[in-house]
Amino acid sequence: MPDSQPQPSPSSSSGGRQDPSALLLCGARLTDGRTVDVRLGGGRIEAVGTAGSLASAPTRGSRVDLSGYLLLPAPAEPHAHADTAQSADTDGPVSYAPEDVQRRATEAALLQLGHGATALRAHVRVGDVQGLGALGAVLQARRSLRGLAELTTVAVPRLLTGVAGADGLAMLRDALKMGAAVVGGCPDLDPDPTGYVEAVLELAAEHGCPVDLHTDAADPGRLARLAAQCGGLRPGVTLGPCGALPAEHASRTADQLAAAGVTVVCLPQGSCGAVTGRGTAPVRLLRAAGVRVAAGSGALRDVSNPVGRGDPLEAAYLLASREGLRPEDAYDAVSASARAVLGLPEVRVEAGFPAELLAVRGERLAGALSLAYSRIVVHRGRVVARTSAVREYCNSAVAAESGLPRQGRGEVS
Protein backbone atom coordinates (compact mmCIF):
# COMPACT_ATOMS: atom_id res chain seq x y z
CA MET A 1 0.00 0.00 0.00
CA PRO A 2 1.52 3.38 -0.98
CA ASP A 3 2.02 6.16 1.51
CA SER A 4 -0.95 8.46 1.98
CA GLN A 5 -0.57 11.86 0.41
CA PRO A 6 -0.60 14.91 2.69
CA GLN A 7 -4.00 16.53 3.17
CA PRO A 8 -4.52 20.24 3.77
CA SER A 9 -5.11 20.97 7.42
CA PRO A 10 -8.00 23.26 8.35
CA SER A 11 -5.69 24.93 10.86
CA SER A 12 -3.10 25.92 8.25
CA SER A 13 -5.46 27.43 5.69
CA SER A 14 -5.68 30.92 7.17
CA GLY A 15 -2.69 33.21 7.04
CA GLY A 16 -0.17 30.40 7.24
CA ARG A 17 -0.84 29.86 10.92
CA GLN A 18 0.22 26.46 12.20
CA ASP A 19 -1.79 24.32 14.57
CA PRO A 20 -0.01 24.19 17.96
CA SER A 21 -1.90 21.00 18.76
CA ALA A 22 -0.50 19.18 15.71
CA LEU A 23 1.04 15.81 16.55
CA LEU A 24 3.63 13.69 14.78
CA LEU A 25 3.71 9.96 15.52
CA CYS A 26 7.16 8.67 14.61
CA GLY A 27 8.27 5.15 13.71
CA ALA A 28 4.96 3.33 14.19
CA ARG A 29 4.43 -0.12 12.75
CA LEU A 30 1.25 -0.85 10.79
CA THR A 31 -0.52 -4.18 10.46
CA ASP A 32 0.73 -4.50 6.86
CA GLY A 33 4.32 -4.48 8.13
CA ARG A 34 5.28 -0.93 7.14
CA THR A 35 7.01 1.41 9.58
CA VAL A 36 5.70 4.93 9.16
CA ASP A 37 5.43 8.45 10.47
CA VAL A 38 1.89 9.80 10.89
CA ARG A 39 1.10 13.51 11.06
CA LEU A 40 -2.12 14.59 12.78
CA GLY A 41 -3.81 17.96 12.72
CA GLY A 42 -7.29 19.37 13.11
CA GLY A 43 -8.50 16.09 14.56
CA ARG A 44 -7.63 14.14 11.42
CA ILE A 45 -4.73 12.26 9.88
CA GLU A 46 -2.92 14.72 7.61
CA ALA A 47 -0.24 12.45 6.17
CA VAL A 48 1.30 9.00 6.43
CA GLY A 49 4.85 8.53 5.15
CA THR A 50 7.81 6.21 5.34
CA ALA A 51 9.54 6.32 8.72
CA GLY A 52 11.73 9.41 8.91
CA SER A 53 10.12 11.17 5.94
CA LEU A 54 7.80 13.35 7.99
CA ALA A 55 10.04 13.66 11.02
CA SER A 56 12.65 15.47 8.91
CA ALA A 57 10.18 18.23 8.03
CA PRO A 58 10.16 21.48 10.05
CA THR A 59 8.85 20.73 13.51
CA ARG A 60 5.41 21.96 14.52
CA GLY A 61 3.43 20.73 17.46
CA SER A 62 4.54 17.68 19.45
CA ARG A 63 6.20 14.39 18.59
CA VAL A 64 5.63 10.94 20.03
CA ASP A 65 8.13 8.16 19.41
CA LEU A 66 6.19 4.99 18.59
CA SER A 67 9.17 2.77 17.90
CA GLY A 68 8.17 -0.73 18.97
CA TYR A 69 4.44 0.08 18.83
CA LEU A 70 1.73 -1.20 16.53
CA LEU A 71 -0.61 1.60 15.41
CA LEU A 72 -4.29 0.71 14.99
CA PRO A 73 -7.62 2.43 14.50
CA ALA A 74 -8.97 3.03 17.99
CA PRO A 75 -11.57 0.55 19.27
CA ALA A 76 -14.99 1.55 20.53
CA GLU A 77 -17.23 0.14 23.25
CA PRO A 78 -20.69 -0.63 21.77
CA HIS A 79 -22.32 -2.09 24.89
CA ALA A 80 -21.56 -0.72 28.35
CA HIS A 81 -23.79 -0.34 31.42
CA ALA A 82 -22.76 2.99 32.87
CA ASP A 83 -25.31 3.23 35.69
CA THR A 84 -24.30 -0.07 37.30
CA ALA A 85 -20.59 -0.21 36.36
CA GLN A 86 -18.25 -0.96 39.27
CA SER A 87 -21.13 -1.16 41.74
CA ALA A 88 -19.94 -4.58 42.94
CA ASP A 89 -16.91 -2.85 44.45
CA THR A 90 -19.02 -1.07 47.06
CA ASP A 91 -19.89 -2.36 50.53
CA GLY A 92 -23.56 -2.70 51.40
CA PRO A 93 -26.49 -1.68 49.18
CA VAL A 94 -25.60 -0.04 45.87
CA SER A 95 -26.16 3.70 45.89
CA TYR A 96 -27.96 5.21 42.92
CA ALA A 97 -27.60 8.75 44.17
CA PRO A 98 -26.76 10.92 41.14
CA GLU A 99 -23.30 11.81 42.40
CA ASP A 100 -22.42 8.13 42.92
CA VAL A 101 -23.73 7.06 39.52
CA GLN A 102 -21.84 9.92 37.86
CA ARG A 103 -18.61 8.98 39.63
CA ARG A 104 -18.88 5.29 38.73
CA ALA A 105 -19.84 6.06 35.13
CA THR A 106 -16.92 8.45 34.75
CA GLU A 107 -14.43 6.04 36.29
CA ALA A 108 -15.66 3.20 34.08
CA ALA A 109 -15.41 5.32 30.94
CA LEU A 110 -11.88 6.41 31.86
CA LEU A 111 -10.92 2.79 32.50
CA GLN A 112 -12.15 1.83 29.04
CA LEU A 113 -10.53 4.90 27.49
CA GLY A 114 -7.21 3.79 28.97
CA HIS A 115 -7.67 0.50 27.14
CA GLY A 116 -8.23 2.39 23.88
CA ALA A 117 -12.00 2.94 23.55
CA THR A 118 -12.39 6.57 22.48
CA ALA A 119 -16.16 6.15 21.96
CA LEU A 120 -18.67 4.32 24.15
CA ARG A 121 -22.37 3.51 24.07
CA ALA A 122 -23.83 3.20 27.58
CA HIS A 123 -27.16 1.57 28.41
CA VAL A 124 -28.96 3.29 31.30
CA ARG A 125 -32.16 2.12 32.97
CA VAL A 126 -35.02 4.62 33.13
CA GLY A 127 -38.25 4.41 35.11
CA ASP A 128 -39.13 2.39 38.21
CA VAL A 129 -37.75 3.90 41.41
CA GLN A 130 -34.80 5.54 39.66
CA GLY A 131 -36.88 7.62 37.28
CA LEU A 132 -34.50 9.68 35.16
CA GLY A 133 -31.94 10.21 37.92
CA ALA A 134 -29.39 7.69 36.66
CA LEU A 135 -29.69 8.98 33.10
CA GLY A 136 -29.11 12.53 34.27
CA ALA A 137 -26.00 11.42 36.14
CA VAL A 138 -24.59 9.57 33.12
CA LEU A 139 -25.30 12.57 30.89
CA GLN A 140 -23.35 14.69 33.35
CA ALA A 141 -20.50 12.18 33.14
CA ARG A 142 -20.70 12.53 29.36
CA ARG A 143 -20.21 16.26 29.65
CA SER A 144 -17.26 15.86 32.02
CA LEU A 145 -15.58 13.49 29.54
CA ARG A 146 -15.86 15.88 26.61
CA GLY A 147 -12.53 16.08 24.81
CA LEU A 148 -11.40 12.75 26.25
CA ALA A 149 -13.99 10.31 24.92
CA GLU A 150 -17.40 10.28 23.23
CA LEU A 151 -20.10 8.80 25.47
CA THR A 152 -23.60 8.24 24.10
CA THR A 153 -26.53 6.95 26.13
CA VAL A 154 -29.24 4.36 25.50
CA ALA A 155 -32.47 4.77 27.47
CA VAL A 156 -33.62 1.34 28.73
CA PRO A 157 -37.21 1.16 30.06
CA ARG A 158 -38.51 -2.01 31.69
CA LEU A 159 -42.15 -2.17 30.54
CA LEU A 160 -43.80 -0.43 27.59
CA THR A 161 -47.13 -2.24 27.11
CA GLY A 162 -50.37 -2.44 29.06
CA VAL A 163 -51.33 -0.21 31.97
CA ALA A 164 -47.93 -0.60 33.63
CA GLY A 165 -46.17 0.27 30.38
CA ALA A 166 -47.83 3.67 29.99
CA ASP A 167 -45.52 5.20 32.58
CA GLY A 168 -42.52 3.54 30.95
CA LEU A 169 -43.43 4.96 27.57
CA ALA A 170 -43.83 8.46 29.00
CA MET A 171 -40.50 8.08 30.80
CA LEU A 172 -38.83 6.97 27.57
CA ARG A 173 -40.11 10.05 25.76
CA ASP A 174 -38.76 12.26 28.54
CA ALA A 175 -35.41 10.45 28.38
CA LEU A 176 -35.05 11.27 24.69
CA LYS A 177 -35.92 14.91 25.33
CA MET A 178 -33.35 14.91 28.14
CA GLY A 179 -30.52 13.81 25.86
CA ALA A 180 -30.57 10.04 25.43
CA ALA A 181 -29.41 9.33 21.88
CA VAL A 182 -30.66 5.76 21.41
CA VAL A 183 -33.90 3.91 22.24
CA GLY A 184 -33.19 0.67 24.06
CA GLY A 185 -34.86 -1.92 26.21
CA CYS A 186 -35.40 -5.62 26.80
CA PRO A 187 -38.55 -6.88 25.07
CA ASP A 188 -38.09 -10.35 26.58
CA LEU A 189 -39.04 -8.92 29.99
CA ASP A 190 -42.31 -7.37 28.80
CA PRO A 191 -45.55 -9.42 28.84
CA ASP A 192 -46.03 -8.40 25.19
CA PRO A 193 -42.59 -8.49 23.49
CA THR A 194 -44.04 -7.71 20.05
CA GLY A 195 -45.93 -4.70 21.39
CA TYR A 196 -42.78 -3.58 23.21
CA VAL A 197 -40.77 -3.62 19.98
CA GLU A 198 -43.54 -1.79 18.12
CA ALA A 199 -43.50 0.97 20.74
CA VAL A 200 -39.70 1.26 20.56
CA LEU A 201 -39.63 1.40 16.76
CA GLU A 202 -42.42 3.96 16.60
CA LEU A 203 -40.66 6.25 19.06
CA ALA A 204 -37.29 5.78 17.32
CA ALA A 205 -38.81 6.66 13.94
CA GLU A 206 -40.47 9.71 15.48
CA HIS A 207 -37.17 10.99 16.87
CA GLY A 208 -34.89 9.69 14.09
CA CYS A 209 -32.66 7.77 16.47
CA PRO A 210 -31.14 4.26 16.49
CA VAL A 211 -32.50 1.26 18.38
CA ASP A 212 -30.42 -1.02 20.60
CA LEU A 213 -32.28 -3.89 22.27
CA HIS A 214 -31.29 -6.58 24.74
CA THR A 215 -32.25 -10.15 23.97
CA ASP A 216 -30.73 -13.52 24.77
CA ALA A 217 -32.39 -14.92 21.60
CA ALA A 218 -33.59 -18.03 23.43
CA ASP A 219 -36.87 -17.91 21.47
CA PRO A 220 -35.95 -18.03 17.74
CA GLY A 221 -39.55 -17.39 16.69
CA ARG A 222 -39.66 -14.21 18.72
CA LEU A 223 -36.29 -13.16 17.32
CA ALA A 224 -37.54 -13.77 13.77
CA ARG A 225 -40.56 -11.54 14.41
CA LEU A 226 -38.30 -8.90 15.92
CA ALA A 227 -36.04 -8.98 12.85
CA ALA A 228 -39.05 -8.64 10.56
CA GLN A 229 -40.29 -5.65 12.55
CA CYS A 230 -36.89 -3.96 12.45
CA GLY A 231 -36.14 -4.44 8.77
CA GLY A 232 -35.33 -1.21 6.96
CA LEU A 233 -35.35 1.07 9.99
CA ARG A 234 -32.79 3.84 9.73
CA PRO A 235 -30.41 4.81 11.26
CA GLY A 236 -30.33 1.19 12.34
CA VAL A 237 -31.14 -1.56 14.82
CA THR A 238 -28.73 -3.41 17.09
CA LEU A 239 -29.48 -6.54 19.10
CA GLY A 240 -27.43 -8.31 21.72
CA PRO A 241 -26.00 -10.35 23.22
CA CYS A 242 -27.97 -13.23 21.61
CA GLY A 243 -26.03 -15.72 23.71
CA ALA A 244 -28.81 -18.31 24.04
CA LEU A 245 -29.70 -18.73 20.37
CA PRO A 246 -30.50 -22.45 19.87
CA ALA A 247 -27.96 -24.11 17.60
CA GLU A 248 -30.61 -25.87 15.52
CA HIS A 249 -32.20 -22.52 14.58
CA ALA A 250 -29.04 -20.42 14.34
CA SER A 251 -28.49 -20.64 10.58
CA ARG A 252 -32.02 -19.64 9.60
CA THR A 253 -32.10 -16.90 12.22
CA ALA A 254 -28.78 -15.52 10.97
CA ASP A 255 -30.20 -15.25 7.46
CA GLN A 256 -33.25 -13.40 8.81
CA LEU A 257 -31.08 -10.95 10.75
CA ALA A 258 -28.89 -10.34 7.70
CA ALA A 259 -31.92 -9.71 5.49
CA ALA A 260 -33.25 -7.18 8.01
CA GLY A 261 -29.90 -5.38 8.24
CA VAL A 262 -29.73 -5.92 12.00
CA THR A 263 -26.37 -5.71 13.78
CA VAL A 264 -25.54 -8.12 16.61
CA VAL A 265 -23.33 -7.07 19.52
CA CYS A 266 -21.92 -10.10 21.33
CA LEU A 267 -20.35 -10.03 24.79
CA PRO A 268 -17.36 -12.40 24.88
CA GLN A 269 -16.37 -11.29 28.40
CA GLY A 270 -19.69 -12.09 30.06
CA SER A 271 -23.36 -11.26 30.23
CA CYS A 272 -25.31 -8.30 31.56
CA GLY A 273 -28.14 -7.74 33.99
CA ALA A 274 -30.92 -7.54 31.42
CA VAL A 275 -30.40 -11.08 30.14
CA THR A 276 -29.63 -14.46 31.65
CA GLY A 277 -26.94 -16.97 30.84
CA ARG A 278 -23.31 -16.64 29.89
CA GLY A 279 -23.31 -17.97 26.35
CA THR A 280 -21.87 -16.18 23.35
CA ALA A 281 -23.63 -15.57 20.05
CA PRO A 282 -22.57 -17.86 17.16
CA VAL A 283 -20.19 -15.26 15.79
CA ARG A 284 -18.75 -17.14 12.83
CA LEU A 285 -22.15 -18.32 11.64
CA LEU A 286 -23.60 -14.81 11.89
CA ARG A 287 -20.67 -13.32 9.99
CA ALA A 288 -20.91 -15.98 7.29
CA ALA A 289 -24.58 -15.08 6.80
CA GLY A 290 -23.67 -11.43 6.29
CA VAL A 291 -24.64 -10.09 9.72
CA ARG A 292 -22.47 -7.30 11.03
CA VAL A 293 -21.10 -8.49 14.37
CA ALA A 294 -19.51 -6.18 16.92
CA ALA A 295 -18.18 -7.09 20.36
CA GLY A 296 -18.61 -5.26 23.64
CA SER A 297 -17.91 -5.62 27.34
CA GLY A 298 -21.41 -5.71 28.83
CA ALA A 299 -21.58 -5.60 32.60
CA LEU A 300 -18.47 -4.31 34.34
CA ARG A 301 -18.05 -5.34 37.98
CA ASP A 302 -21.70 -5.18 38.93
CA VAL A 303 -24.07 -7.66 40.58
CA SER A 304 -24.54 -9.67 37.37
CA ASN A 305 -20.81 -9.84 36.59
CA PRO A 306 -18.56 -8.89 39.52
CA VAL A 307 -15.39 -9.11 37.42
CA GLY A 308 -14.26 -7.63 34.12
CA ARG A 309 -11.69 -5.30 32.62
CA GLY A 310 -13.77 -3.40 30.09
CA ASP A 311 -10.96 -3.97 27.59
CA PRO A 312 -11.86 -4.14 23.88
CA LEU A 313 -8.65 -6.00 23.13
CA GLU A 314 -9.63 -8.69 25.60
CA ALA A 315 -12.96 -9.04 23.80
CA ALA A 316 -11.07 -9.40 20.51
CA TYR A 317 -8.69 -11.92 22.08
CA LEU A 318 -11.64 -14.03 23.25
CA LEU A 319 -13.22 -13.93 19.80
CA ALA A 320 -9.96 -15.20 18.34
CA SER A 321 -9.25 -17.84 20.99
CA ARG A 322 -12.79 -19.13 21.64
CA GLU A 323 -14.64 -18.44 18.41
CA GLY A 324 -11.79 -19.09 15.99
CA LEU A 325 -11.79 -15.69 14.29
CA ARG A 326 -8.64 -14.44 12.63
CA PRO A 327 -7.00 -11.71 14.75
CA GLU A 328 -7.84 -9.17 12.04
CA ASP A 329 -11.53 -10.10 12.07
CA ALA A 330 -11.60 -10.20 15.86
CA TYR A 331 -10.15 -6.70 16.06
CA ASP A 332 -12.59 -5.48 13.43
CA ALA A 333 -15.43 -6.50 15.77
CA VAL A 334 -14.21 -4.07 18.45
CA SER A 335 -13.07 -1.33 16.08
CA ALA A 336 -14.65 -0.85 12.63
CA SER A 337 -17.84 -2.77 13.40
CA ALA A 338 -18.17 -1.25 16.86
CA ARG A 339 -17.76 2.25 15.44
CA ALA A 340 -20.40 1.47 12.81
CA VAL A 341 -22.83 0.50 15.58
CA LEU A 342 -22.26 3.91 17.13
CA GLY A 343 -22.80 5.65 13.79
CA LEU A 344 -19.22 6.90 13.71
CA PRO A 345 -17.11 7.38 10.56
CA GLU A 346 -14.62 4.75 9.50
CA VAL A 347 -11.04 5.05 10.71
CA ARG A 348 -7.99 3.92 8.76
CA VAL A 349 -4.37 4.85 9.28
CA GLU A 350 -4.47 6.88 6.08
CA ALA A 351 -4.57 10.58 5.28
CA GLY A 352 -7.97 12.19 5.62
CA PHE A 353 -9.41 9.82 8.21
CA PRO A 354 -10.32 10.77 11.80
CA ALA A 355 -7.36 10.73 14.19
CA GLU A 356 -8.84 8.09 16.51
CA LEU A 357 -5.90 5.77 17.12
CA LEU A 358 -4.47 3.21 19.51
CA ALA A 359 -0.77 2.39 19.73
CA VAL A 360 0.06 -0.87 21.50
CA ARG A 361 3.48 -2.29 22.31
CA GLY A 362 4.09 -5.10 19.84
CA GLU A 363 4.89 -5.97 16.26
CA ARG A 364 1.85 -7.93 15.08
CA LEU A 365 -1.84 -7.89 15.83
CA ALA A 366 -1.99 -11.40 17.30
CA GLY A 367 0.73 -10.51 19.78
CA ALA A 368 -0.97 -7.23 20.63
CA LEU A 369 -4.22 -9.00 21.45
CA SER A 370 -2.30 -11.34 23.74
CA LEU A 371 0.08 -8.99 25.54
CA ALA A 372 -1.00 -5.41 24.93
CA TYR A 373 0.08 -3.92 28.24
CA SER A 374 1.60 -0.60 27.15
CA ARG A 375 -0.78 1.62 25.19
CA ILE A 376 -1.10 5.17 23.90
CA VAL A 377 -4.58 6.42 23.02
CA VAL A 378 -5.27 9.26 20.58
CA HIS A 379 -8.66 11.00 20.40
CA ARG A 380 -9.33 13.88 18.03
CA GLY A 381 -5.66 14.08 17.19
CA ARG A 382 -4.22 14.33 20.68
CA VAL A 383 -2.92 11.85 23.23
CA VAL A 384 -5.60 11.39 25.89
CA ALA A 385 -4.33 8.32 27.77
CA ARG A 386 -1.09 6.41 28.31
CA THR A 387 -0.48 3.09 30.01
CA SER A 388 3.11 1.97 30.57
CA ALA A 389 4.00 -1.49 31.83
CA VAL A 390 7.46 -2.51 33.02
CA ARG A 391 8.27 -6.12 33.83
CA GLU A 392 11.32 -6.77 36.00
CA TYR A 393 13.08 -10.01 36.89
CA CYS A 394 15.55 -10.49 39.69
CA ASN A 395 19.18 -11.13 38.79
CA SER A 396 20.01 -14.81 38.43
CA ALA A 397 22.70 -16.99 36.96
CA VAL A 398 20.17 -18.63 34.65
CA ALA A 399 19.14 -15.29 33.16
CA ALA A 400 22.74 -14.21 32.70
CA GLU A 401 23.83 -17.44 31.04
CA SER A 402 20.86 -17.79 28.72
CA GLY A 403 20.79 -14.17 27.59
CA LEU A 404 17.07 -13.85 28.29
CA PRO A 405 15.57 -10.42 27.56
CA ARG A 406 15.09 -8.42 30.75
CA GLN A 407 13.68 -5.08 31.76
CA GLY A 408 14.57 -3.34 34.95
CA ARG A 409 17.10 -1.30 36.85
CA GLY A 410 19.14 -3.53 39.08
CA GLU A 411 18.04 -6.29 41.37
CA VAL A 412 14.48 -6.68 42.57
CA SER A 413 14.24 -7.64 46.19
Where are these regions (language model features)?
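His/Asp/Glu-enriched, well-ordered alpha-helical/loop segment
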Residues: P210, R234-P235, A281-V360
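Active-site mouth loops of central-metabolism enzymes
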Residues: T90-R103, V154-A166, C186-D188
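Histidine-centered catalytic micro-motifs
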Residues: A74-A85, V211-A218
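Active-site core of metal-dependent hydrolases
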Residues: P157, T161-V163, L176-R278
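C-terminal cap of metal-dependent C-N hydrolases
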Residues: V349-S413
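Alpha-helical scaffold segments that flank or form the walls of functional sites
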Residues: Y69-L71, P75-E77, Q86-H123, D128-R146, ...
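Histidine-rich, glycine-flanked metal-binding segment
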Residues: M1-L72
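Divalent metal-coordination and catalytic microenvironments
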Residues: A28, G43, G68, H79, ...
